[in-house]
Amino acid sequence: LCIRANLDCVWVINEWDSIIPNLVSGNYDTIIAGMSITAERDEVIDFTQDYFPPSPSVYMGMSGADIDVDSAVIAAQTATIQAGYVAESGATLVEFATAEETISAVQNGEADAVLADGDYLASIIAESNGEFANIGEVSIGGGVGMGIRESDTELKAKMNAAISSMKDDGSLNALIKKWFGFEAATF
């Protein structure tokens, strides 16, 4: 995207729970961190068009467990669309700073299940030797886009043009398949 937009990008690592405040305060110019486009986030920042299509979120629990996700204790990473969804669902939400901690919470019995990005949990379930199972899916969010300050209209236009050109020539789909597998949703 940086090459297509003719920009010299410098990558910065930031904790998830402060990622939007640090964008708004000018510590960096964009967020490209798997951030789902939501109406709530769009009130604070702007988004490019999606560069990754929406994929379902997955509830993952211990294999064989009888879990009603509407009344269970559900772990989710803090400040994610999944945490927001659980908070509004009526289930009991337990939040953790990292996705890894949510999985540990299920393993140690602190939570009945975790709700997280399905693409992330698919490999964990597959590699768990039957310890974990997909116990349900839900679609939330509007795809993944770059977060940009609302005042940065020129940067948004450049990034949207770069994303559009990569969608048009198929290179974005090729990257999605390379990094997320041939089963991943594409444009």
Residue ranges of model-derived segments:
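Extended ligand-binding regions for polar small-molecule ligands
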Residues: 1-5, 70-71, 76-81, 145-183
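Extracytoplasmic small-molecule ligand-binding "clamshell" domains
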Residues: 1-34, 169
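Bilobed "Venus flytrap"/periplasmic-binding protein-like clamshell domains
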Residues: 1-3, 35-36, 53-104, 118-122, ...
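Extracytoplasmic
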Residues: 6, 18, 25-26, 42, ...
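Alpha-to-beta junction loops
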Residues: 6-8, 24-33, 107-120, 130-131
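Short helix-initiation/N-cap motifs at beta->coil->alpha
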Residues: 10-22, 78-79, 94-108, 142
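Acidic, Gly/Pro-rich loop/turn segments at junctions of secondary structure
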Residues: 35-43
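Periplasmic-binding protein-like
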Residues: 53-58, 118, 122-164, 180-187
